Amino acid sequence: MARYDVLVVGGGTGNNVAAAAADAGLDTALIEKGPLGGTCLNRGCNPSKMVIQAATAANHVREAERFHVEAAFGGVDFAAVIDDVEATLSPIAEGMAARYREKDHLTLYSDEAVFVDERTVEIGGERVSADRVVVAAGSRPLVPPIEGLDEVDYLTSTDALSR
């Protein structure tokens, strides 16, 4: 069984904890089943701002006449917007993972962690333990309890940014 000083589950804000621990010379395991950067980089803050920017541009074209500008609105290619989001943000997560794989005192596990006791996790059939464990994982969109919402086709941020 691999043993570390610090074990961090979650590569969103948890990656900052893991990097700081490794920089302090502590042998650190960082476990993330998805791309590094967590919700903010991959499914929340950053991609939503890019989608909002596309919507803002579309709205400017639709309202151009108000400003005595001739422009024709031909629609939004949402798939192309999402392609741009992925093309912009995926390299950031991939670059982060590449840097972490080269970082002294840091081991990156790209799989799901399942706790077997309070200081040990199983990752793809391998057990890993540590003296200190940080759990910084599990963010998911909140679907508010709005009457009738279950009767309509709604999207969460994860749904909207997926194909």
Task: Annotate each language-model stretch with its function.
Residues 1-11:
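Beta1/beta-strand and adjacent pyrophosphate-binding region of the FAD-binding site
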Residues 2-4, 20-26, 31-163:
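Glycine-rich flavin
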